[in-house]
Amino acid sequence: NKVYHNNNLVWQKQFFIYNNGVIGNNGNIWVHWSAYPNNYEFNKNENGKLIARGGYGDTQLKIISGGYNVSGYSMLHVVGNYELNIANYGEDWFGLSSVANDYNPNICNQYMKIGDTAKSFHLQIPFSFNGTAYFNWRFLTFHKMYISQIYVV
């Protein structure tokens, strides 16, 4: 899954679990986001919805990674880095904070502020967890965004 050249990593397999509105063939991710006063959800059957939120306040994007069998238990087992790419439209800046460590203390808080020239960014999370990983992203003061891809490397 990795290729080295002169001891330098030059390529490694990327395991997409969400890519431009298409869930990876494993189909084991469920994404939920909510914006006051309404709550919205999209899963593998409702991909690529805009995350629209105007004005001030929090919008939360919750990513639950892991397959669920008929009994409702997670089948996730991933060790590696977890990356989230998000596109931003029409807003000068927005904040993104991860409070994933509320659910898994091995994952640290991360926060990022994007200037008005930035159209997208990715956030890489050190990730080593066996079970259900519940990420709670808080988006602050943005207008329109959408998830472009989520993948494990």
Task: Name each region found by the language model.
Residues 2, 8-39:
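Extracellular carbohydrate-recognition regions
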Residues 19-22, 50, 64-88, 125:
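Extra-cytoplasmic beta-strand recognition segments
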Residues 54-71, 91-93, 103-107:
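Secreted extracellular polysaccharide-interacting domains
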Residues 101-130:
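Extracellular carbohydrate recognition and processing domains
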Residues 136-143:
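Short beta-strand-plus-loop segments that form exposed binding edges in beta-rich domains
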